[in-house]
Swiss-Prot record:
Monomer. Interacts with DRG1 (via its N-terminal); the interaction phosphorylates DRG1. Gene3D superfamilies: Phosphorylase Kinase, domain 1 (3.30.200.20), Transferase(Phosphotransferase) domain 1 (1.10.510.10). The gene is Stk16. It comes from Mus musculus (Mouse). GO terms for biological process: cellular response to transforming growth factor beta stimulus; positive regulation of transcription by RNA polymerase II; protein autophosphorylation; protein phosphorylation. This is Serine/threonine-protein kinase 16. The modification Phosphoserine is found at S197. Membrane-associated protein kinase that phosphorylates on serine and threonine residues. In vitro substrates include DRG1, ENO1 and EIF4EBP1. Also autophosphorylates. May be involved in secretory vesicle trafficking or intracellular signaling. May have a role in regulating stromal-epithelial interactions that occur during ductal morphogenesis in the mammary gland. May be involved in TGF-beta signaling. Able to autophosphorylate on Tyr residue; it is however unclear whether it has tyrosine-protein kinase toward other proteins.
């Protein structure tokens, strides 16, 4: 778990015997805060995520999130630099030290372009989609599913490469549901941990005897692709208007026509947004299709036959 942390004078903290200077607050959620800190030993910037732990279960979940990070050494999954639990009287805070991405998230980029009246081009979308899919492939290969994939949980590296973050909702990929009590428990868990407008249909009304697998991530990936194509998720407006997302996701998605997108990309999106999870493709199938669709590298020329 790393060494204990101490908050020192002049806004510095010590993590694993290294001192970090507080720079500014980056954001906050319901029970967590993210600060920008500078490593005084190397001059690099980091994101320090502080999770408030009110109960023992909160500590266990924070530690599990750290363990999920440590499972992966992958260019499309966020690395954990250090983890520790800080005690402050009867209260605890779990601290995760993470790399800082100055480009922000995929959603920041979508919003930036939308403010200019434009969208990501297909040649920009395809490499992003490939990187996100490779990150998911690595997660699924370890027997897990992300369960909360959305544009705000995808960071952009210096070269624009996508990096999956927020692994706190990850759980086993394949869940065998046996009985109404287990179904309701999973449904309640999803309502708390899986963002509503990116949540797969099978998680809104979990059947008493069924299998929920990693293809919930494929649905969410389809929603992310839609957001890259059209500047907002397919169910964002449904949620914002107060209409039922649970009802909306049970119907086949209507994909707007646009000259910006090829029929191949539209077909790929349509396959991801298949309501029946058993008919939805697995990530390796999508990857093989995506690799064939990738634009040529700069300086490369394709020959038309």
């Amino acid at each position: 778990m790393g060494h204990a942390l101490c908050v020192c004078s002049r806004g510095t903290v010590i993590i694993d015997n290294k001192r970090y200077l507080f720079v500014q607050k980056l954001g906050e959620g319901g029970f967590s805060y993210v600060d920008l800190v500078e490593g005084l030993h190397d001059g690099h910037f980091y994101a320090l995520k502080r999770i408030l732990c009110h109960e023992q279960q909160d500590q266990e979940e924070a530690q599990r999130e750290a363990e999920m990070h440590r499972l992966f050494q992958h260019p499309n999954i966020l690395r954990l630099m250090a983890y520790s639990l800080k005690e402050r009287g009867a209260k605890h805070e779990a601290w995760l030290l993470l790399p800082f991405f100055k480009k922000g998230t995929l959603w920041n980029e979508i919003e930036r372009l939308k403010d200019q009246g434009s969208f990501l081009t297909e040649d920009q979308i395809l490499p992003l989609l490939l990187g996100i899919s490779r990150g998911l492939e690595a997660i699924h290969a370890k027997g897990y599913a992300h369960r909360d994939l959305k544009p705000t949980n995808i960071l952009l590296g210096d070269e624009g490469q996508p990096v999956l973050m927020d692994l706190g909702s990850m759980n086993q990929a394949c869940i065998q549901v046996e009985g109404s009590r287990q179904a309701l428990a999973l449904q309640d868990w999803a309502a708390q941990r899986c963002t509503i407008s990116y949540r797969a249909p099978e998680l809104f009304s979990v059947q008493s005897h069924c299998v929920i697998d990693e293809r919930t991530d494929v649905w969410s990936l389809g929603c992310v692709l839609y957001a890259m194509m059209f500047g907002e998720g397919p169910y964002d407006m449904v949620f914002q208007k107060g209409d039922s997302v649970a009802l909306a996701v049970q119907n086949e998605l209507s994909i707007p026509q646009s000259p910006r997108h090829s029929s191949a990309l539209r077909q790929l999106l349509s396959s991801m947004m298949t309501v029946d999870p058993q008919q939805r493709p697995h990530i390796p199938v999508l990857l093989s299709q995506l690799e064939a669709l990738q634009p040529p590298a700069p300086g490369q020329h394709t020959t038309q036959i």
